[in-house]
Amino acid sequence: FRFERPKSRTQREFWQFGAEVIGESDPAIDAQIIYLGHRILSDLGIREHCELKINTIGSVEDREKYLDALANFYAGKERSLSPTGREKLEQKKYLDLLDPRTEDEEVLAKMAPKITEFLSPDSQEFFDQMLSSLNSFGIEYTIDPTLIRPLQYYSQTTFEFRKKDSREKILVGGRYDGLGKKIGHEKVLGGCGFAAGMERTIALMKE
């Protein structure tokens, strides 16, 4: 069940399937997870109807610098935001503002600073190594600097398989090294995986 208010074309109750790799921090794992998602959608006969978007969101330290930049960017732009957007701004959910609900918010999201401007050398190297591994699989993708995960425990790689000519997400994933400590583990526990909406996948198969 979704806790937050469902957006357009989303449901409160839904089914999903996915895959996870826990305890590994090798960027090649991220590439393998993306390739697994690609293969599943290919075997279901819908990969050609999806486009793969990829980005890096860097380390926790990179994100903190980025959040400061977003706070400065959105300051004074309340009138261009929807009621929901203004609520996000008041709650300092700056990353959520990059998932726009209106045309004005979409324009602002495109103008906003990009996380790639704040990457440390280590984060950039991780992303480069991941892309090198992914390229060996020979699959098509687009690097999208606006692709961000609002959840604070995500880091480094993030990706989405979207329905072409649409913002509808079919399969979404990324790296979440910060999740282990958030739920009580003593140390940082590497993790990477994806989840796909069952209902959206079936609907696309029927088209």
Q: What is the role of each PLM region?
A:
Residues F1-E207:
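TRNA-recognition modules of translation machinery and tRNA-sensing kinases, especially anticodon-binding
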